[in-house]
Regions:
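Short, Lys/Arg-enriched N-terminal segments with co-localized hydrophobic residues
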Residues: 40-42, 46-57
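Selective transmembrane helix interface/packing segments
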Residues: 52-394
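Cationic, amphipathic, low-complexity alpha-helical segments enriched
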Residues: 1, 5-22, 26-29, 35, ...
């Protein structure tokens, strides 16, 4: 009987103490036999600690499957914002540079230096009617621009941007990153062919077929132009290729791989311009011959998606050129991210200069250059590089 009375008194005392405890500690009391000290705090192994109140460390959150996907979604959102911003100002930079090349002012009315011109154009296109021609395959007609813009952005998941302190600016560091970029980028040909076929327009169809022939013709030369780089570095990981430039030979500074594979660089630049359907290789959308090519029947946001995919692809091949031939984010004392941006901007200017300088090639000249010019030269470059590596390495 005495034991029961003492237990009842203990329970009533614990209940009174529980009402005066802070909520985190009070919530931890699960059994009436928990012991308290004179200050009303839990005593023994059940005591509330600072680690319990602050929660698990970040590493445990990332290791958790849900936390891992949260980090991935946040990273992809930030990357999407950065690439969209870069694309918008690439269009502005191109229009200003072409204006200077052609001795005209370019966009200078909306905002300071015309910086808000792209926002005005985007709002205008967003409110335009998205006209769908009659007798079209509506599913494919809508799917085609979605494939184009999705493939363009997906390639950036494996492209490293650089370092900033201890932070590493890339999402996925895979050991076959360059192959993944090529595989995703090759989906662009399906988007163009499907868009041309589903539009029920002869000019759109001809533009789509031209694009398919052009991309297939130059993809092989583009891939073979990079094989000597892979042979020298011994890796397909983009980060390894960028870091190789600071560890090559007896040098301590960045040694760009263009000095080792200059022919591969020239082939890459020409093939990359053709792969992105840019002037002077913009045959799929030749206005004088095909009105607008595969874009003839597209308007509104669907046209914007194709337009956006073209410029994202242009930034992608410029970033790859900086990584594969010019040391990526290594540029002496310049911070890595800024060094990478400087190199990408220089390649973008090269694209714009080519558009403002050279006329469009004829279709037969384009095919002859791809099959009889670049492809044999790329194969010979691979063979010569292999012979030199065997001779040097023994």
């Amino acid at each position: 009987m005495g034991g029961a009375v003492r237990a009842g008194r203990r329970a009533r005392r614990d209940a009174r103490l529980r009402r005066h405890l802070p909520h985190p500690a009070r919530d931890r009391i699960q059994d009436p036999g928990a012991r308290f000290d004179g200050a009303g705090a839990l005593a023994g192994p059940r005591a509330d600690t600072r680690a319990d109140r602050t929660g698990p460390p970040v590493s445990q959150i990332y290791d958790n499957p849900i936390g891992h996907w949260v980090v991935v979604v946040v990273a992809m959102t930030l990357l999407l914002f950065v690439v969209l911003t870069a694309t918008a100002y690439t269009v502005w930079f191109e229009r200003v540079a072409l204006g200077r090349i052609q001795r005209r002012p370019g966009p200078n009315r909306v905002g300071p230096f015309g910086l808000l011109q792209l926002a005005a154009d985007g709002i205008k296109l967003a409110f335009k009617e998205s006209f769908v021609p009659g007798k079209t395959d509506k599913v494919l007609y809508v799917l085609a621009p979605t494939i184009a813009v999705g493939a363009a952005f997906l390639a950036w998941a494996v492209i490293p941007i650089g370092l900033w302190g201890n932070a590493q600016y890339w999402i996925a560091d895979v050991n076959v990153g360059i192959l993944l970029v090529f595989a995703v980028s090759s989906l662009n040909v399906y988007a163009i062919v499907i868009g041309g076929y589903s539009s029920n327009n002869k000019y759109s169809l001809l533009g789509g077929l031209r694009s398919a022939a052009q991309l297939i013709s130059y993809e092989m030369a583009l891939g073979l132009s990079l094989v000597p780089t892979f042979m020298i570095v011994g890796s397909l990981r983009l980060r390894d290729i960028a870091e190789y430039t600071v560890h090559w030979g007896p040098y301590t500074g960045p040694i760009p791989l263009i000095l080792l594979t200059p022919i591969g660089f020239v082939i890459y630049i020409i093939a990359a311009v053709a792969e992105t359907n840019r002037a002077p290789f913009d045959l799929p959308e030749a206005e004088q011959e095909l009105i607008g090519g595969f874009l003839t029947e597209y308007s509104g946001l669907k046209f914007v998606m194709y337009y956006l995919a073209e410029y994202v692809n242009m930034i992608t091949v410029s970033a790859l050129a900086a990584l594969l031939f010019f040391g990526g984010w290594y540029l002496w004392v310049i911070p890595p991210v800024f060094a990478f941006l400087i190199k990408v901007i220089l390649f973008l200017f090269l694209y714009i200069w080519l558009r403002g300088t050279f006329p469009r090639l004829r279709y037969d000249m384009l095919m002859r250059l791809g099959w009889k010019g670049l492809l044999p030269l790329a194969v010979a470059n691979v063979v010569v590089t292999a012979i030199i590596l065997v001779a040097v390495q023994g």
